[in-house]
């Protein structure tokens, strides 16, 4: 196990990484600082299909240590620049806080005498389409140290692995030779989460300070805008599409839509109204299938009750953030009673 091997010789491993990152070759003579000996290793790839098909990538343990070091130093600096209502992968924020915040806005819009509308923005294959050149330009505006930029570029543009997809192509259907080297971020990297927020902060700032949108909220690439005039909202959409195309080199997909604010708003796995936050049907379906699978393993004697209980408790913890009285009763009737009887 590479993790245990690294930890067993932690001091030596850290010194080795330090030397590679600080440009000293083995003979102790300083080398060219722009040609350090640190290179990102090869990625391990894994296909996952829930909640949707994706390629998850993982680096070796030493490379993850380097990522963590840069993340700890850089993320707090960039986080200060983010807007209040950006909720993805930030300390003290998350899906629950994002849903709760949006729900406080919905009554203000749906109760007004003037009809409000909701713009739901969905960026096509966001993590697979981030442009490396654009990302480096954004980073270079805030980071002046060329040595740090050089190492970040190695994380962003890996010479051994392509992260990008051609427009309109699904990851599970893309041939290896068709993957793109100058686009995309590896799903699974800690730094990818940071870069994803930094990249779309350009859109956040544009919407808040140029378009003066008050009710704007984002969780990664899931974005909601509330606005009191439908025609003006179409104009806002056109301005956003222009920025995405000309400056960020991104596109919106067909899920992008404008709907009346009195209809349930779909956001981060939920249907949100002024009175309820309901778990999306697809999420409920996956949850029931998983519980049914776990229940079958338990009844066949293939897993212990502790494993079943842990799964059930995790789902109960998830459900408590939704308006889900009937759903909770159904789970208890369908699964918990039978499982506890069998235990």
Language-model region placement:
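Conserved polymerase palm-domain catalytic core
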Residues: 13-16, 20, 42, 105, ...
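PAPS/PAP-binding and catalytic site of the sulfotransferase fold
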Residues: 70-73, 237-240, 244
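A common structural junction motif
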Residues: 143, 241-249
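Conserved two-metal-ion catalytic palm core of "right-hand" nucleic acid polymerases
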Residues: 1-138, 143-144, 160-163
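Surface-exposed helix-capping loop/turn segments at secondary-structure junctions
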Residues: 27-32, 80, 209-215, 248-252
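Right-hand nucleic-acid polymerase module
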Residues: 59, 68, 172-182, 205, ...
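Beta-rich nucleic-acid/ligand-interaction surfaces
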Residues: 89-98, 224-227, 258-262
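A generic structural signal for residues located within well-ordered alpha-helices
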Residues: 61-65, 191, 195, 263
């Amino acid at each position: 196990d590479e993790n245990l091997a690294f930890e067993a010789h932690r001091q030596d491993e850290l010194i080795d990484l330090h030397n590679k990152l600080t440009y000293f070759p083995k003979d102790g003579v300083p080398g060219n600082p722009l040609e350090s000996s640190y290179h990102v290793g090869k990625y391990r790839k894994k296909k996952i299909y829930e909640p949707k098909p994706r390629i998850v990538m993982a680096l070796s343990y030493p490379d993850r240590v380097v990522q963590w070091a840069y993340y700890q130093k850089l993320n707090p600096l960039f986080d200060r620049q983010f807007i209040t209502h950006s909720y993805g992968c930030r300390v003290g924020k998350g899906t629950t806080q994002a849903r709760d915040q949006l729900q406080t806005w919905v009554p203000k819009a749906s109760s007004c005498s003037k009809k409000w509308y909701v713009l739901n923005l969905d960026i096509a294959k966001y993590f697979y389409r981030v442009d490396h050149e654009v990302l480096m330009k954004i980073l270079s505006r805030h980071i002046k140290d060329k040595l740090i930029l050089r190492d970040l570029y190695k994380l962003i543009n890996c010479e051994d692995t392509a992260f990008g997809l051609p427009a309109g192509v699904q990851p599970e259907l893309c041939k290896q030779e068709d993957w793109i080297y100058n686009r995309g971020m590896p799903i699974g990297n800690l730094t990818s989460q940071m870069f994803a927020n930094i990249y779309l902060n350009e859109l956040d700032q544009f919407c808040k300070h140029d378009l003066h949108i008050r009710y704007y909220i984002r969780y990664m690439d899931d974005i909601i805008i509330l606005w009191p005039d439908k025609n003006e909202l179409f104009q806002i959409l056109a301005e956003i599409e222009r920025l995405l195309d000309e400056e960020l080199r991104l596109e919106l997909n067909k899920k992008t839509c404008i709907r009346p604010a009195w209809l349930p708003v779909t956001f981060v796995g939920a249907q949100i109204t002024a009175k309820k936050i309901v778990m999306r049907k697809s999420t409920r379906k996956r949850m029931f299938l998983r519980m049914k699978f776990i229940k079958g393993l338990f009844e066949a004697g293939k897993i212990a009750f502790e494993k079943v209980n842990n799964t059930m408790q995790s789902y109960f913890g998830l459900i408590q953030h939704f308006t889900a009285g009937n759903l909770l009763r159904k789970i208890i009737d369908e699964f918990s009673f039978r499982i506890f009887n069998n235990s």
